[in-house]
């Protein structure tokens, strides 16, 4: 009888394991169980990437934003994602209203559904980091880690193309961004393409690490066009929160450090790991990649006929990474959203320069 109970217990544990989300291959974000067209304003944030983590941390602690959305009957809800591409299905299916996305996920989303690009949240260079000097000239056959369908994926494609190679000429290793520095140090990969803080962590912890390629990279606050049409006032309050986040950090270093600490707290709560980045390193990244970017979150105007993301769009289209019928006009329409101008024209209503954050 005792043996029967033991076997019953083992079978129960086995059944629980086999039916768990992890064992069934269910994505981590499935547990959010986001419904379509919820009353709340649901935003996807990225607590493992900088400076996106800081902007997400400030938006979700913004008391002014929360009060305004509550008054509209649309409470704020934020959800953490490991990468922007994990949000795309949810944004396309009205399960998220907005997300902080890199350039490639923004393009991929615009190819699928109508979106509004509300503002710039990062402008910098994504890096290809390697253990070996001169690796760029000898990429063929190397093990290169990347995050599929991310801005770093685009940088990796650029690096390969610059030496006449394609994805088929290397061994691609899909890997979480926070695992890349350790994998490089352990020799499990020969290099990785990533956004901050992974390059900074690798360079600080591994003397042999080198940046062998940099590619331009940008992040955006992206809203679904359906959300903007149905709830234009709520959309404008989100834009005001983005302005507040950047302007508050620009006031002084103490504010930047507070944003970093909140972001690190959120990242650790999400990943279950202690931050690998120091406070000073995170402040440097934030200053370089968004705080000191002139006029941000305003998106830089076109230079001649050179529109934002047009080069990236054309490059990805040539490589067959976009649906064949995708037109540039869809992305151009996304950049035409004038929420920033509307908020800036009514400061008394949207309070973009008044600050009230939860500790």
Where in the sequence are the language-model features?
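Short, glycine-/small- and polar/acidic-enriched structural segments
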Residues: 25-174, 190-193, 211-215, 340-344, ...
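Bacterial N-terminal signal peptides
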Residues: 8-19
């Amino acid at each position: 009888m005792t043996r029967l109970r033991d076997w019953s217990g083992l079978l129960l544990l086995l059944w629980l394991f086999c039916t768990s989300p992890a064992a069934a291959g269910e994505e981590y974000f499935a547990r959010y169980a986001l419904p379509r067209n919820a009353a709340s304003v649901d935003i996807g944030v990225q607590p493992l990437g900088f400076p996106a983590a800081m902007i997400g941390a400030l938006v979700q602690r913004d008391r002014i934003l929360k009060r305004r959305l509550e008054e509209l009957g649309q409470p704020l809800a934020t959800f953490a994602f490991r990468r922007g591409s994990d949000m795309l299905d949810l944004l396309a299916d009205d399960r998220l209203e907005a997300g902080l996305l890199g350039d490639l996920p923004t393009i991929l989303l615009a190819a699928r559904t109508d979106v509004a690009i509300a503002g710039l949240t990062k402008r910098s260079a994504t890096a290809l980091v390697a253990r070996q000097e001169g690796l760029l000239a000898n990429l063929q056959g190397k093990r290169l880690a990347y995050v599929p369908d991310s801005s770093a994926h685009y940088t990796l494609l650029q690096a390969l193309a610059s030496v006449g190679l394609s994805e088929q000429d290397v061994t691609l290793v899909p890997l979480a961004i926070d695992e890349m520095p350790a994998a490089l140090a352990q020799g499990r990969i020969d290099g990785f393409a990533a956004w901050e803080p992974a390059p900074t962590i690798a360079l600080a912890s591994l003397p042999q690490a080198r940046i062998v390629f940099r590619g331009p990279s940008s992040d955006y606050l992206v809203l679904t066009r359906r959300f903007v049409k149905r709830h234009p006032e709520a959309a404008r309050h989100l834009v005001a929160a983005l302005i507040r986040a950047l302007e508050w950090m620009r006031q002084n270093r103490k504010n930047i450090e507070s944003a970093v600490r909140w972001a690190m707290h959120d990242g650790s709560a999400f990943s279950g790991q202690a931050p690998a980045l120091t406070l000073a390193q995170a402040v440097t990244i934030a200053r370089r990649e968004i705080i000191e970017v002139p006029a941000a979150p305003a998106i830089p105007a076109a230079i001649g006929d050179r529109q934002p993301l047009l080069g990236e769009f054309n490059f990805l289209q040539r490589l067959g990474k976009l649906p064949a019928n995708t037109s540039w006009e869809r992305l151009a329409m996304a950049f035409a959203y004038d929420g920033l101008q509307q908020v800036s024209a009514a400061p008394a209503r949207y309070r973009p320069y008044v600050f009230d954050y939860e500790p």
